[in-house]
Structures are given as C-alpha cells and as structure tokens.
C-alpha cells in the first residue's frame, strides 16, 4: 500500500504489510455498554456477502496538531491542510481495502479541507473529542450530510468510537476519534499502517457494531474468542503485556467481527448500493468427530475451484477469559487456538 512522506509533496512510500517496526501501545476507550444493538448471544452460522458494495459517507476532521504534523509549512506547494488531506486519504484507502475485502463496505470521504483545522489554538477540539466532533460535524455539515464521523489527532496513542453500533444514529454517529504519535519505538521513520488499522480501522469497526475479540480481559458479550490479546483488527495485539500474541494486529477481521458488522448494517437503512460480480458457494463441514483431550489434529478442506481467488482461515468461536496463565489444551471453554492470517493454504494443524 501507499503512504505519503511527511514534508515531501512528490514522494510516497510503497510497501507491503510487515511486522518489522513498532509504535507505542494503543488504548481503546470504547465502552461496549454504549451500544445501540439488540444484544444476541454468540452463535456460529453461515455468513454470505451479497453481490453489492454498500457505501457510507464518512466525514473526517482533524485537530490542529494533526494538520501541523503532516504539513510542511510551505504554501507554495500546497497548504498544510492539503498536506493533511493526503494523509487522511492514505489512511482511508487502507481502511477501505480491508472493509471492502471482508465486509463489502466502502467509506466515501464527503468532507473537505475546511474540517482539517490548521491551528491547535483555534480548532474546536479541547480534549472532549467525542462531543466536540459531534457538534462540529452537525454544525458544519448537518446531520443529514454524513453517515459517520471520525477525528484524527496527533498525540499519545488513544482512541474511542463513542459507541458500539451507531453509524447513521443521530447525535452518536460523529463521536469517533483516533490519536497517534506517528513514530515507531526504535525512533525510525514512521512507515507502516498501524494508525490506519490498529486505531482507525478498530474504532470504525466499533462504530459499525463490532465488539472486542480478545480474551485476556473477559467481556460478557460472547465474542472473547481470541486467546490473550488476540491478533485481528478488533483485538488488542501489542498492548496487553504478557498476554500479547504479537506487536500489532493483522489486516483482517475475525469471524465474530464480520458477523457483528454485517448484522448491524442489515439493521439500518442508510448507505447506497453498487452491484458487483461475486460467486456464492456452500461449504459442507462434514461429520463431527470426538478426539482424545490433548490430541494434535489437522483441519482440512478441499479447496474451491479457481483456488487462486480464495484464501482460508480456521477460527475458534468459544468465548471465555484466556490469558498466558491458563492457555492450554485442557480448557473446557475458551480459545485453544489463535486466528492466523488467511492464506491460500486450506488446511490447518492444531497446535501450530
């Protein structure tokens, strides 16, 4: 993917996803009790994306700190606001790549540089980001002019969606924010998508109805199915200390997150639809098997024809508190296997 180079109008980084550098730990303040969903217990069921992309209008604003960070102070080659807009578009493109792939959801930027504030002393944001952003968007754009809103900020790692499931909900849809220092812990050039996915993608996931999937700190909603910190977008990879599976999240949603989000968007009527070509198929899981406790096993699936077009991931859906202290093959509840980045390999060895 592509990311603008700070202070360089004509240069961009182009690179693939990697885990070689790191940034400071992220803390998500989203409270699941602030949800606008009818709570449903965890259950496994077939999820089939339809043959339409659903587009939602997103308004993105920024603090003066964010705009100043990405601006080079040279108006002869574009204003700081235009520099910040390039960074905003880069982040949104990365988020869209995952949302379109996993969810058939596209986010369309409908705000312009007028909402990318240049001066931290005069911008409308003074620390109460959720309420301040909601007021700003409703005043500048109007409630009917956007489906969800998000604020980008420069500072210590932080984030909050303001809710779980509030896209298109008046007085709630414009309260998400993500804050990042745009550095890595080794002091090198910031050159990764951690802000895009660990922060923005995570909080927008909440706005679309996704709950946390980690299990190091149990949440009573039935979705604590990734051991420890977890590793997908709605988990907490890299910020749970001894329970961390890895430093940062992988660029995909867990089954639970996909189900949460698709259930939510089916419950609302906003957004526009664009038809796409897709191929639906049925998968037969075959008969159930009982194996002795503690036995290694292999999950196998006959690849679908045109194998190159599909990737596969095996995920466990049991929900319970699982930490580094109690993780193991003898638990009666909770995750005994982590989620692994989807690949073209259709089988999975447990443990691996």
Give the ranges of each region predicted by the language model.
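Fold-level signature of zinc-dependent metallopeptidase catalytic domains
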Residues: 11-167
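Soluble non-cytosolic domains of exported or imported proteins
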Residues: 78-90, 191-195, 199, 252-255
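Exoplasmic/lumenal beta-rich domain surfaces
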Residues: 108, 313-352
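The catalytic-center signature of Zn2+-dependent metalloproteases
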Residues: 110-131, 170-252
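Proline/serine/threonine-rich low-complexity linkers at boundaries of modular beta-sandwich domains
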Residues: 264-282
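Proline-centered linker/hinge motifs at extracellular inter-domain junctions
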Residues: 278-287, 325
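Short, solvent-exposed loop/linker segments at the N-terminal edge
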Residues: 285, 289-299
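Acidic, Ser/Thr
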Residues: 300-307, 317
